[in-house]
């Protein structure tokens, strides 16, 4: 199984980036690879319409370490852990997302990587404009 670390540097304070990325209601604004619509809360779980169908998302508890890991339970019942970190960077914050190939073909892995790159670019765009607080 291969892993890839996809990252983007965002010209914003790490705490601001973390707060935005860790807020589930913001997922549809930046994570099109995961959320195509509003997030529905069911206890600690979140239901999201994704390109794969309805998925359940569970985030780690908010923390001061910049960890925004989340599990995604796919429609078939498989659970995928998505490690996501917000790190301090000389130019603001660096967001690092780890993608694991698991049972994906090489082409699927490449497509998944491209989706994550687009999502992180959207996150950067949102946070480097005057939009979100």
Kindly give the residue locations of the regions a language model identified.
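Hydrophobic ligand-binding cavity/cleft-lining segments
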Residues: 1-40
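Structural motif
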Residues: 11, 42, 62-64, 89-91
């Amino acid at each position: 199984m291969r892993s890839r670390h996809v990252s983007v540097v965002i010209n914003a304070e790490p705490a601001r980036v973390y707060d935005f990325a860790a807020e589930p209601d913001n997922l549809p604004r930046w994570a099109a690879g995961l959320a195509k619509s509003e997030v529905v809360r069911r206890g600690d779980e979140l239901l999201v319409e994704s390109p794969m169908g309805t998925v359940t998302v569970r985030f780690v508890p908010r923390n001061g370490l910049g960890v925004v890991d989340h599990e995604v339970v796919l429609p078939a019942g498989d659970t995928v852990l998505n490690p996501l970190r917000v790190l301090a960077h000389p130019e603001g914050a660096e967001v690092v997302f780890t993608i694991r190939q698991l049972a994906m073909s090489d082409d699927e892995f490449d497509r998944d990587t491209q989706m994550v790159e687009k999502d992180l670019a959207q996150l950067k765009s949102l946070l480097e404009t005057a939009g979100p607080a």
